[in-house]
């Protein structure tokens, strides 16, 4: 029950339109398992559609930026999916929607933008991607969806930038994953994935078993898992509430902004980005400094 309540809270935080008493989602050992569950769902949906149309389904691909978290490489390796990555540069430090769509075709199971890139701290422009993707899908007749990897940003954007549209308010965002043990403020390991509606979670991903006299239905790659992290997440939600989380995240952002500003004043360093979107940023040695 506590797990279901956590999923409901997170789904509402991400503006889920689902009207069910229990929102559609699952927990994982970390955001890595949550990413995999979102990816598997996208792959199974694509495969079912291709089978129904009598088309080949042996060459699926996935599109995302070169700043991907390593779990996506593992996911593609395990499920034999081609990974197509859009290079990032200083001129294009986040996923460019047009470049991403140029890599898509009828075999693309989904596009994966990132909210809170782990090695830059930036967010991909998911609203712009959704807009471009909508036009692309209408033109081609495809139904390529978006899975948002919000391992970091999933617990930052709702509190600090609620006006930014990156979540289920967007048409093609069908699933989102996040980490409970990053800005969710729980000890490792805990991850969450939520789908926009139950219809986006393939039935074959639900596994039912009679265990110790009780019927258990779960969606996950692991079976045995500790419950302590779920208790921790639920406790934090109830204890801190929205305002409490907002205060914690704002404090983290204030500290990051101070460090970003001070490092930016040092002649020997350059900040990778002038803007700060998450309590995370990187800097590098000024190439002119040694000269």
Feature annotation, model-predicted:
Residues 288-291:
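Short, conserved charged micro-motifs
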Residues 20-22, 57, 273-280:
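Short Gly/Ser/Thr- and Asp/Glu-enriched loop/turn motifs at secondary-structure junctions
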Residues 117, 159-277, 284-286:
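Active-site C-terminal subdomain of aminotransferase-like
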Residues 26, 30-202:
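Conserved PLP-enzyme active-site core in the AAT-like
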Residues 3-11, 68-73, 96-104, 222-229, ...:
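Structured alpha-helical segments in the cores of large, soluble enzyme domains
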Residues 1-33, 45, 49:
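Conserved N-terminal alpha-helix of the aminotransferase class I/II PLP-enzyme fold
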Residues 3-8, 36-43, 73, 127-130, ...:
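Predominant activation on well-ordered alpha-helical scaffold segments within soluble catalytic domains
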Residues 17-20, 47-56, 243-247:
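Inter-helical turn/loop segments and adjacent helix faces that build the functional surface
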């Amino acid at each position: 029950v506590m797990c279901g309540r956590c999923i409901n809270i997170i789904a509402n935080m991400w503006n889920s339109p689902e009207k069910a008493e229990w929102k559609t989602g699952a927990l994982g050992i970390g955001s890595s398992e949550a990413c995999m569950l979102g990816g598997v769902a996208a792959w199974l949906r694509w495969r079912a559609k291709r089978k129904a149309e009598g088309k080949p389904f042996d060459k699926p691909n996935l599109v995302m930026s070169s700043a991907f978290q390593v779990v996506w490489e593992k996911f593609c390796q395990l499920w034999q999916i081609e990974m197509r990555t859009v290079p990032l540069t200083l001129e294009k430090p986040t996923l460019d929607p047009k470049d991403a769509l140029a890599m898509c075709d009828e075999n693309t199971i989904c596009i994966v933008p990132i909210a809170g890139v782990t090695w830059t701290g930036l967010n991909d422009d998911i609203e712009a991607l959704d807009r471009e993707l909508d036009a692309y899908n209408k033109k081609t007749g495809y139904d390529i969806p978006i899975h948002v990897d919000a391992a970091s940003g999933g617990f930052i954007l709702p509190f600090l930038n609620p006006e930014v549209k990156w979540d289920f308010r967007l048409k093609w965002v069908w699933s989102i994953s996040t980490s409970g043990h990053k800005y969710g403020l729980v000890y490792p390991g805990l991850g969450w994935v939520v789908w926009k509606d139950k219809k986006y979670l393939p039935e074959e991903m639900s596994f039912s078993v009679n265990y110790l006299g009780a019927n258990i239905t779960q969606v996950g790659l692991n079976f045995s898992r500790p419950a302590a992290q779920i208790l921790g997440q639920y406790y934090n939600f109830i204890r801190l509430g929205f305002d409490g989380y907002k205060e914690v995240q704002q404090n983290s952002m204030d500290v990051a902004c101070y460090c970003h500003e001070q490092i930016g004043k040092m002649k020997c360093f350059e900040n990778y980005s002038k803007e700060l979107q998450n309590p995370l940023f990187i800097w590098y040695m000024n190439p002119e400094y040694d000269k």
